[in-house]
Amino acid sequence: MTDTATTPQTTDAPAFPSNRSCPYQLPDGYAQLRDTPGPLHRVTLYDGRQAWVVTKHEAARKLLGDPRLSSNRTDDNFPATSPRFEAVRESPQAFIGLDPPEHGTRRRMTISEFTVKRIKGMRPEVEEVVHGFLDEMLAAGPTADLVSQFALPVPSMVICRLLGVPYADHEFFQDASKRLVQSTDAQSALTARNDLAGYLDGLITQFQTEPGAGLVGALVADQLANGEIDREELISTAMLLLIAGHETTASMTSLSVITLLDHPEQYAALRADRSLVPGAVEELLRYLAIADIAGGRVATADIEVEGHLIRAGEGVIVVNSIANRDGTVYEDPDALDIHRSARHHLAFGFGVHQCLGQNLARLELEVILNALMDRVPTLRLAVPVEQLVLRPGTTIQGVNELPVTW
């Protein structure tokens, strides 16, 4: 058993997180962690502190469902992976940073808009949005930046309609969101966060006098009006949904296109048999795992995991990109296989904090892939994969630009 109380720092704990050198493969350091025996390993964070990372699928599922691990980002022991997390500590918490029962109370206020039935009914609207932006991109072609002309605007418009946020303001909130999630220092992140908070505060004020559509309008008219939620809580909830609702799907779209184009046999099989699309989406989610630093927790009690002791107060990070490449769960885990059953991947997390918007993300990705295969059958990258500039490991994985041609 490893006793972290007597050995709080180890000399061989690698730096975490690491940057990808390939859009769809693990960083070398992550592969080494995965291939090292045991489900838990010590890593060193940017501030010199150490934390546990969870690298095995079974242990990851168990720990993500363990109530002794807290999601409280204001805890001094929370394993921050970047200086920007200091801005999170200084801000009102969205429900992603709350523990039960407060987490459940806040989440239930929004969940009706993300049920399977509700999202299934959005398919015609999502198809309209996807094809509308494809019309514009193709008209301006035969080259494009797939991120700015398609991958980013599609989920931005979809989440705007769902929340009731005016899409006319997309340039502002896309820029502020990007600054927040990609900031390398706390002050820049806090400034971006405050910019978004100010915008949403103004929108709430508007909805109090002129009832608004969408989820935000409903929360203003109901929960805010009757005191179930206060203004700062509403702002933080709306901010979380707005950012997560467009940043993650935009990144998944871009990386999915890169990955499929770089695996032509897999892409050809998908074009030939569209019944494979839902399964291919699950495999891409497993394979790419773009939110691979989202599983940060802090232990509130001692937890023993396969001979390792996580002490109360220690940071734990479930790295879903590594757990999704567990060879005991997935055969040949570093290979893309659109025919495999990847449904039990951890790209959306697990337990009470499992991604609220996962049904919407799946729908958007299915519609996007089908539309691209139908309407841009000759789509290809305009530069070699090796020349693409990848985001660092401290943020949502992806690219900020994706030159394509057809």
From Swiss-Prot:
Gene3D superfamilies: Cytochrome P450 (1.10.630.10). The gene is cyp105A1. The keyword Chaperone does not apply. GO terms for cellular component: cytoplasm. This is Vitamin D3 dihydroxylase. InterPro entries: Cyt_P450 (IPR001128), Cyt_P450_B (IPR002397), Cyt_P450_CS (IPR017972), Cyt_P450_sf (IPR036396). Calciol binds at residues 81, 193, 236, 293. Its main location: cytoplasm. Disulfide bonds: none annotated. It catalyses: calciol + 2 reduced [2Fe-2S]-[ferredoxin] + O2 + 2 H(+) = calcidiol + 2 oxidized [2Fe-2S]-[ferredoxin] + H2O; calcidiol + 2 reduced [2Fe-2S]-[ferredoxin] + O2 + 2 H(+) = calcitriol + 2 oxidized [2Fe-2S]-[ferredoxin] + H2O. Two metabolic pathways exist. One is a conversion of VD3 to 25-hydroxyvitamin D3 and then to 1-alpha,25-dihydroxyvitamin D3 (25-pathway), while the other one is a pathway via 1-alpha-hydroxyvitamin D3 as an intermediate (1-alpha-pathway). Analysis show that the amount of 25-hydroxyvitamin D3 is predominant as the product of this reaction, while very small amounts of 1-alpha-hydroxyvitamin D3 and 1-alpha,25-dihydroxyvitamin D3 are obtained, suggesting that the major pathway is the 25-pathway. The hydrophobicity and the volume of the side chain at position 84 are critical for the activity. Residues 1-24 are annotated as: Disordered. Induction: By herbicides. One of its GO terms (biological process) is vitamin D3 metabolic process.
